[in-house]
Amino acid sequence: MSHRYIPLTEKDKKEMLDKIGASSINELFGDVPKDILLNRDLNIASGEAETSLLRRLNTVANKNVTKETHASFLGAGVYDHYAPAVVDAMISRSEFYTAYTPYQPEISQGELQAIFEFQTLICELTDMDVANSSMYDGITSFAEACILAFNHTKKNKIVVSKGLHYQALQVLKTYVKVREEFEIVEVDLDGTITDLEKLEQAVDDETAAVAVQYPNFYGSVEDLEKIQSFIEGKKALFIVYANPLALGLLTPPGSFGADIVVGDTQPFGIPTQFGGPHCGYFATTKKLMRKVPGRLVGQTQDDEGNRGFVLTLQAREQHIRRDKATSNICSNQALNALASSIAMSALGKQGIYDIAVQNLEHANYAKNQFKDNGFEVLDGTSFNEFVVKFDQPIKDINKKLAKHGFIGGFDLGEASADFENHMLIAVTELRTKDEIDTFVKKAGELNGSK
């Protein structure tokens, strides 16, 4: 009988070796030099009973600091938001819980409709014409948007604000590293917001696109209308990396003339996780529809006039025209897109607005509390994040905060040397007044101690 966790019996091994004409495992690996072979058992503990193993693993897991054990003020792209209970219940259903790409529409109508609804919701939030079925994460969507701009305009310069997520800039640089002709011009900040004078100077007739974040990485809301005015007449694209929850309250980028709007739907129904997965969205205009990366689901009719859904405009994709594909992205995050769709649908337009308002109010309350307690809070119109200056390294402050039941904000020194000892603090609808008050008080005590 085979081991419970190792299904190969000695008989199985013999049959496999006989099939390939090898007499033993050693003969199978005979080409491997003997001096690099490990001639002993692995130095690991022997097996143990399932009950004791679970007990030991739970003991290890209980050492973790999580949002269930600590109040989280950490954001920087991943936020602790409320997810309606219906989200997990729906995405766990067997008809959705699959990574299969629905190439065969006749057997995939439910999945295709779910993706179509996601695309529709994204278009409504961003005020754009068309959205794809999702991408790996917001930063992937951003990098793909920049590549689209290069290819569409046939220009080689892109102007980006340093207010963009620093990892988005890193990924973009990785994307264009093999294309020496591409130039990335980074525009400095004025405090926590893009220096508009320097941005205007950087944009010229050779610019393929201008890219900003909304709200930006430092929590401040950029002036999209003003930025768009710098682009007019330059034949450059306007790319906006937007927090979709903030769009429940802020004027959507499409209303300011954005050509491409990208972002991450993690705030809607996707929990905070160590390393993901997330769900990027990519929305654009009809003019650029045929250059969109990733999958597109369209609505159609069958021979009998019934409404149906199919993957459409597939000639853009590498499984149809590999050498002329708009992108090498051939997958998506359909399950997470479904989670976000369910969350948005459960909340509704008013619910999204209400939660966005709560984020705004809670963050501004926390900002004022920090000011009242003697902290320097950097100026900027905030949504749910803001920057606070400390007298000590943020890494040390956060270690101490964890001992008092708090997950502190992001150490901005990791993003930029200009923000050493600055903390990016996120305050969502889940943070209570008592948690905020205690967090600010404890931060003040720790900041004053050596």
From Swiss-Prot:
The keyword Oxidoreductase applies. GO terms for molecular function: glycine dehydrogenase (decarboxylating) activity. It catalyses: N(6)-[(R)-lipoyl]-L-lysyl-[glycine-cleavage complex H protein] + glycine + H(+) = N(6)-[(R)-S(8)-aminomethyldihydrolipoyl]-L-lysyl-[glycine-cleavage complex H protein] + CO2. InterPro entries: GcvPA, GDC-P_N, GDC_P, PyrdxlP-dep_Trfase, PyrdxlP-dep_Trfase_major, PyrdxlP-dep_Trfase_small. Keywords: Oxidoreductase. GO terms for biological process: glycine decarboxylation via glycine cleavage system; nucleoside metabolic process. Its EC number is 1.4.4.2. It comes from the Bacteria. It is an enzyme of class 1 (oxidoreductase). The keyword Oxidoreductase applies. NCBIfam families: PRK00451.1. Belongs to the GcvP family. N-terminal subunit subfamily. PANTHER family: GLYCINE CLEAVAGE SYSTEM P-PROTEIN, GLYCINE DEHYDROGENASE (DECARBOXYLATING). The glycine cleavage system is composed of four proteins: P, T, L and H. In this organism, the P 'protein' is a heterodimer of two subunits. The glycine cleavage system catalyzes the degradation of glycine. The P protein binds the alpha-amino group of glycine through its pyridoxal phosphate cofactor; CO(2) is released and the remaining methylamine moiety is then transferred to the lipoamide cofactor of the H protein. This is Probable glycine dehydrogenase (decarboxylating) subunit 1.
